[in-house]
Amino acid sequence: VPHFAVDLSHIDEPHKHPALKEAGEFTDIREISLNLPREDGGLLAYSRAIAQWHKTHRFCGRCGHPSEPKDGGHMRLCTNPDCNTQHFPRTDMAVIMLVSSGDKVILGRKKEWAEDRFSILAGFVEPGETIEGAVAREVMEEVGIPITNIRYHSSQPWPFPSNLMLGFFAEAESETINIIDDELAEARWFTREELLDEAKAYAEKPHSVSIARRLISEWTLGIEP
């Protein structure tokens, strides 16, 4: 079944536009995705990523000439006949990992987050790096803790703008936190008991969007691999 997506990001208030005000409601993709079935959520994520790619890749990276959409928007072609380079949507690989030590898990807070907002650690995969290597490196860079027993859990597209999140569990070899880089304002250990109420609430909402929340909840409820 064909599906179509239209980028309206250039319109400040689309709900007031004469041609759109009767089209329905407009809302943030992160909010609506919480209430969508998995199939619709995936379609929405794909549409968002493709639209953003077209918006930010209007010129050929090889010769600088304009490029134009082809193949229903799944490819862009350089308009320079001497170049004729095909360009395809990019996907940035990132790892996100829940690191535990016995009955505790380490969560961090970014500097721009509210003081009560914490999440598991994450970071991008470097060129030429294995995803397992990225997991170990990011944990060491962010909290200075060596890890072992790295286990893959699942993946999730995160089109803000074009990430693919790869989720892992791992075990800490030390509980001494040493924030090395400047990404985190703080990091600390949380017990299962501290996270239990939120985990139970998540279990009642299986379509909830965040892979971070899924990993935390499954670990808290004891269903990790």
Where are these regions (language model features)?
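Short acidic-glycine loop/turn motifs at beta-strand connectors
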Residues: 1, 101-103, 174
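The catalytic Nudix box helix
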Residues: 119-154, 168, 174-176
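Acidic pyrophosphate-coordinating catalytic loop
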Residues: 156-165
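Non-heme Fe(II)/2-oxoglutarate
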Residues: 164-187
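Nudix hydrolase/Nudix homology domain
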Residues: 1-57, 68-70, 114-118, 180-225
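Cys/His-rich short segments
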Residues: 45-98
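N-terminal strand-loop-strand
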Residues: 76-119, 124, 146-147
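Conserved hydrophobic/aromatic beta-strand scaffold that supports enzyme active sites
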Residues: 5, 59, 77, 96-98, ...
